[in-house]
Curated annotation (Swiss-Prot):
Belongs to the RRP7 family. GO terms for cellular component: cell junction; centrosome; cilium; CURI complex; cytoplasm; nucleolus; nucleoplasm; small-subunit processome. This is Ribosomal RNA-processing protein 7 homolog A. The keyword Cytoplasm applies. It is linked to Microcephaly 28, primary, autosomal recessive: A form of microcephaly, a disease defined as a head circumference more than 3 standard deviations below the age, sex and ethnically matched mean. Brain weight is markedly reduced and the cerebral cortex is disproportionately small. MCPH28 is an autosomal recessive form characterized by reduced head size (down to -8 SD) and variably impaired intellectual development apparent from early childhood. It is found in: Nucleus, Nucleolus; Cell projection, Cilium; Cytoplasm, Cytoskeleton, Microtubule organizing center, Centrosome. GO terms for molecular function: RNA binding. GO terms for biological process: blastocyst formation; cilium disassembly; protein localization to nucleolus; ribosomal small subunit assembly; ribosomal small subunit biogenesis; ribosome biogenesis; rRNA processing. SUPFAM superfamilies: RNA-binding domain, RBD (SSF54928). The gene is RRP7A. The modification Phosphoserine is found at S99. Residues 59-159 form the RRM domain. It comes from Homo sapiens. Keywords: Cell projection, Cytoplasm, Cytoskeleton, Disease variant, Intellectual disability, Nucleus, Phosphoprotein, Primary microcephaly, RNA-binding. The keyword Nucleus applies.
């Protein structure tokens, strides 16, 4: 019985790869030196009928169990044999179909996930997804022509990439602020158009507007407000300190008057005893 099981395993090693229901398994290795294989679980990305999706239907491959050393460039290269890859995006967890997709910033983004991830691979043609589902391995992530950095070399590269280019950073910030200002202007224009106009039920929305315009929430305005609050707080603390000092000085003055009064009393008693006291 044991010999029969060994014979079946030796004859059919790849066809018995356990994988989640509906997924195909693709074995990969970090390099040629690695003996054990790691498995990527892939399926065609799809959503329910009538639900909007961020990714194009029939051209997107959803990948599970992506190891940390497998980058977007590595996945694009590994799957390029199946067809032209349009884009690859790694994420911590799968996207909700209903959630709107926000453009990712090149500089202002959270730290990379230190663990296994999921990936969305978009091919230019649907045939790329079909070829990826039938792909056999093992595929090599790091090769001589396309080495993947690891260890201290990866740390050095990550540190160098963490220092942003000032000009590129300025361009991205300016672009974001222009889009934000345009959005605020559109919202204000829409609110102004709807002001005083009754809705379907006859209600009129009343918006309170101050006589003075609100300060723009810029960094300079925020710094001025903070400086004004600091001066007000320090002035209040200074006034409290002077009042406390005034009470202290008044108490010391009264103590000195009492001391001088006692000294004058003793001197008068001494002069009376010596019969030299002449008050006039």
């Amino acid at each position: 019985m044991v010999a029969r099981r060994r014979k079946c395993a030796a004859r059919d090693p790849e066809d018995r790869i356990p994988s989640p229901l509906g997924y195909a398994a693709i074995p990969i290795k970090f390099s040629e030196k690695q003996q054990a294989s790691h498995y990527l679980y892939v399926r065609a990305h799809g959503v329910r009928q009538g639900t909007k999706s961020t990714w194009p239907q029939k051209r997107t491959l959803f990948v599970l169990n992506v190891p940390p050393y497998c980058t977007e460039e590595s996945l694009s290269r590994l799957l390029s044999t199946c067809g032209l890859v349009q884009s690859v995006e790694l994420q911590e967890k799968p996207d909700l179909a209903e959630s709107p997709k926000e453009s990712r910033s090149k500089f202002f983004h959270p730290k990379p996930v230190p663990g296994f991830q999921v990936a969305y691979v978009v091919f230019q043609k649907p045939s790329g997804v079909s070829a990826a589902l039938a792909l056999k391995g093992p595929l090599l992530v790091s090769t001589e022509s396309h080495p993947v950095k690891s260890g201290i070399h990866k740390w050095i590269s990550d540190y160098a990439d963490s220092v942003p280019d000032p000009e590129a950073l300025r361009v991205e910030v300016d672009t974001f602020m222009e889009a934000y200002d345009q959005k605020i202007a559109e919202e204000e224009a829409k609110a102004k158009e709807e002001e005083g106009v009754p809705d379907e039920e006859g209600w009129v929305k009343v918006t309170r507007r101050g006589r003075r315009p609100v300060l723009p929430r810029t960094e300079a305005a925020s710094l001025r407000v903070l400086e004004r609050e600091r001066r007000k707080r320090s002035r209040k603390e200074l006034l409290n300190f002077y009042a406390w000092q005034h009470r202290e000085s008044k108490m010391e003055h009264l103590a000195q008057l009492r001391k001088k009064f006692e000294e004058d009393k003793q001197r008068i008693e001494l002069l009376r005893a010596q019969r030299k006291f002449r008050p006039y």
